[in-house]
Amino acid sequence: SQSLYYHFIYRVTAENPTLQIVIVAGNHDSAARLEAPLPLLQAMRTEVRGVVRKSDDGEIDYDHLTVELKNRDGEVELLCMAVPFLRQGDYPTVPTEGNPYAEGVRELYTQLLQRLWKRRKENQSILAIGHLQAIGSEIAEKDYSERTVIGGLECVSPDAFSEQIAYTALGHIHKAQRVSGRENVRYAGSPIPMSFAEKHYHHGVVEVTFDGGCAVDIMRVECPRLIPLMSVPNGEPASPEIVLEILKELPVTEGAEPYLEVKVLLDEPCLLYTSDA
């Protein structure tokens, strides 16, 4: 997977000389390892933010969470808030009777935005990138590849993303969706299914065009499903005998063979095959 990751960055930046890439760590990533080769990746116009750096006195290095993005003419057009998944200790401590995690995350985004707003020039937009679960976001009930916290202890209010931010691109939730109905705050979702719970999702990416400090066009681009996903049975698990009959009746596929999820219901030990060997 690491070989594919680095090879992709090399190829896509080599084939697109003005392309810049910004990557932030998610909750499943080794943040320090992801950021370790940063000097080499920067030579390929790729910025990675895995950890929240702090000074010796404990102050957050907000400059490290800021990435300047240039247009084809080489002019800075976007100031990017590149914020990785925030763990305990990454965000400011906020006195609150509510959710300390959510309030701390909100405060980090607020302080970072204040710095960028003072720094931005005319016709420059602010873009935010984050990896978190927003309150009200929709996940698949049986999708165990998405980590949720009981009671919503790590759910962040969409109010953390000010209207001063032209577009907010969020990760963590695999299903594409607007956050609280806001057109410019979205989960693009995963470009491919991450589990069989997502076999009915429409996967893709979001293409955003900026001009004059605003996101002037937001368009969803669907990704083709290269390998189909099938579940047998399509509904709830069934006995081994029923499952075997369904498998026998499956049609011969043309092209890529599907990934198959077989759901077998066993309410007691079951011996299906014996061998004299």
Which residues fall in each region the model found?
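Internal helical hairpin/lid segments
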Residues: 244-272
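Conserved beta-sheet core of the metallophosphoesterase superfamily
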Residues: 42, 48, 134-212
